[in-house]
A protein has these predicted regions:
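Bateman (tandem CBS) regulatory domains
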Residues: 2-12, 66-76
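Conserved protein kinase catalytic domain
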Residues: 8, 25, 46, 55, ...
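Cytosolic regulatory modules rich in charged/polar residues
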Residues: 84, 107-137
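Short beta-to-alpha loop/turn elements within the nucleotide-binding domains of ABC transporters
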Residues: 2, 19, 49, 66, ...
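The conserved cystathionine-beta-synthase
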Residues: 14-32, 39, 79-96, 103, ...
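A glycine-centered beta-loop-beta connector
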Residues: 28-31, 36-52, 92, 100-116
Length: 137
């Protein structure tokens, strides 16, 4: 019913393992996002830095110093671009994370967040409401 490729955000903000943590924070704030995938020089996913990781860094040190690699989550749940959207939805419902990276041949090609799924699922409902409203009046 729903295609992963149609739902995922393809213009993904990413960082490298050696990106300074203060720059990661700047990107989170500037793009109003809650997590940034960490990729290597071949665009392979090696981790993710989330707001939770940043708070963890702040709890053990004063200020924001270090690199993305030092504070990233290494075991990241990801999906292939051809995986079923229902499986992705179930994963986001049953786990604490808010987004999942989408891979193709092991390389990052997109990301799907809870917000992306809600927006995509509700879009047809909004269209039906407009049509229904127009027909009624």
């Amino acid at each position: 019913m729903y295609e992963t490729k149609a739902i995922m955000t393809t213009d993904v903000v990413v960082v490298n393992p050696d990106t300074p943590l203060d720059q990661v924070v700047d990107l989170l704030v500037a793009h109003d996002i809650t997590g940034i995938p960490v990729v290597d020089h071949e665009n392979r996913l090696v981790g993710i830095v989330t707001e939770k990781n940043i708070l963890g860094a702040l709890s053990v040190q004063e200020g924001i110093c270090g690199t993305a690699e030092a504070f990233m989550t290494r075991d990241v749940v990801s999906f292939d671009e051809n995986d079923d959207v229902i499986a992705i939805c179930e994963c986001l419902v049953n786990n604490h994370f808010r987004r999942v990276p989408i891979l193709s041949h092991g390389k990052l090609v997109g990301i799907i967040s809870r917000r992306d799924l809600i927006r995509y699922i509700l879009e047809p409902i909004g269209t039906r409401r407009v049509v229904h409203h127009t027909v009624r009046h």
